[in-house]
Amino acid sequence: MDQTSIQTSDGEAATANTLKYMPGFGNDFETESLPGALPQGQNSPQKCNYGLYAEQLSGSPFTAPRGTNERSWLYRIRPSVRHTRRFSNASYPLWKTAPCLDEHSLPLGQLRWDPIPAPAERLTFLEGVRTITTAGDAATQVGMSAHAYVFNEDMVDDYFFNADGELLIVPQLGAIRVFTEMGIMDVEPLEICLIPRGMMFKILKSGEQTVWRGYICENYGAKFTLPDRGPIGANCLANPRDFKTPVAAFEDKETPCRVHVKWCGKFYVTEIGHSPLDVVAWHGNYAPFKYDLRTFSPVGAIRFDHPDPSIFSVLTAPSEDAGTANVDFVIFPPRWLVAEHTFRPPWYHRNIMSEFMGLIHGQYDAKEEGFVPGGISLHNMMLPHGPDALAFEKASNTELKPVKLDHTMAFMFETRYAQQLTKYAAELETLQDNYLECWDGLERKFDGTPGIK
């Protein structure tokens, strides 16, 4: 990519050292990459400075309540109507959309996979998305899909926007550069980023490894927001100041480019003669952001018992039923375990919610073996799950002194809807055939006599 064609708010080429961000969650931001490009006192002047075009990008209906009303005003080199021409059909057969009831022979059950294989061919991020599960219905804007991605090639002249939902990207191996209409974000493992529905972007490699891998939650429903803290109060969990939105940056490039679109589960492509990432200035609250998971401030039991995992929610996308999420993004970060007379790992559970889990690095305390970084587990609604036999015996017999659970970061996409497995996931070579055996060592201890066994 020609770095000299990219200009940031400092008028410099966009390098890792020059990228800047604006702190806050849901703020009404303003930023310009050329002085005076942002109109003051109005949104739509008769003529914009620098010959720019004013355009509004709406993330909510005009009449949504003020607290959930989202829109941004963009001041760009060309209006978006010039960024699409006649569309033709495109195909990304491994990226599926709900409802998706693929036919496969894998029966219902608790499932776990090792990391998806590195590609033998050259793949961009867009070409490297592999859907594992789908839930709900994208056309009616409910539910989500869980994907893995693996790629090794930059999206140089290829751009993409997703009309079906917002994308929460969780890198696991390799940092990525996410160049959106509204600015540039460098995102490394242990960070996440969110790209709003309908926003144009491309993704580039960062670093020197041979493969880049991670996870994606495609949220079809109401957008992700911060969960209510309730009696926790005004602090802890994910604090708003730790979310970072990029400053304005634009790519001024007059070369053949392709714009790819996902709309109602189908893919289309159109060819244009310039970069669509041409927003010189913008203001508003509909914007991408990134977040460092290491800044999450966990709370937990400081005397006894194991609290519900909802205390580890970073973001939640609500449904129409209060307290029932369309999808939650939950992490299991480093933390101190201090509970007395308590089985400290997550307890055995059957749940109305369906849980897709991934591991960014380290070990997960309920599954010290078999669940590896880059791996995936799926525990669908009402299917039992919990610590394996090794973790149970260890936690049941260990000395209960304060212990720091360190060097770990697991996460969960949890939804109220059943997660339907794709044919790709059902037939993936990394599926662990012996996963259920992890509980085989949990033998009967009950013999009818009182006392600790």
Swiss-Prot record:
Provide any one GO MF term from the record: iron ion binding
Summarize where homogentisate binds, as residue positions: Y364, H385
**According to its UniProt record, which residues of this chain constitute the active site?**
H306 (proton acceptor)
Q: What is its EC number?
A: 1.13.11.5
Pfam families to which the protein is assigned, alphabetical: HgmA_C (PF04209), HgmA_N (PF20510)
Q: What is this protein called?
A: Homogentisate 1,2-dioxygenase
**Family, per the entry?**
Belongs to the homogentisate dioxygenase family.
- What are the record's GO terms for cellular component? cytoplasm
Fetch the PANTHER family from UniProt.
Answer: HOMOGENTISATE 1,2-DIOXYGENASE
Q: Quote the gene name from the UniProt entry.
A: hmgA
